[in-house]
Amino acid sequence: MPIVSKYNNEQFDALMNDLITALEKHKAPVDLSLMVLGNLTTNIINGMAPAQRQAITEKYIQALTASVDHRHDAH
């Protein structure tokens, strides 16, 4: 999501591929995948210090919104 990251591409790609593989293994449809990833996101944020939660949530929402392709023909 971010353009500049403190994580290297290999670390990011490995984790993302593991998550995609798990969703594919369970043949999770889009709605179930989003529910699981949403709950995972919530658990990660709730594990942070309470004072940080609101700010990180807002940054996450902004990054997610910016990364979604809003064209009607996008796939």
UniProtKB/Swiss-Prot annotation:
HAMAP family (alphabetical): UPF0352 (MF_00816)
Highest taxon, organism lineage: Bacteria
The protein, known as: UPF0352 protein AHA_1665
Family: Belongs to the UPF0352 family.
InterPro entries in UniProt: UPF0352 (IPR009857), YejL_sf (IPR023202)
Family matches, as SUPFAM superfamilies: YejL-like
Organism field: Aeromonas hydrophila subsp. hydrophila (strain ATCC 7966 / DSM 30187 / BCRC 13018 / CCUG 14551 / JCM 1027 / KCTC 2358 / NCIMB 9240 / NCTC 8049)
One Pfam entry name: DUF1414
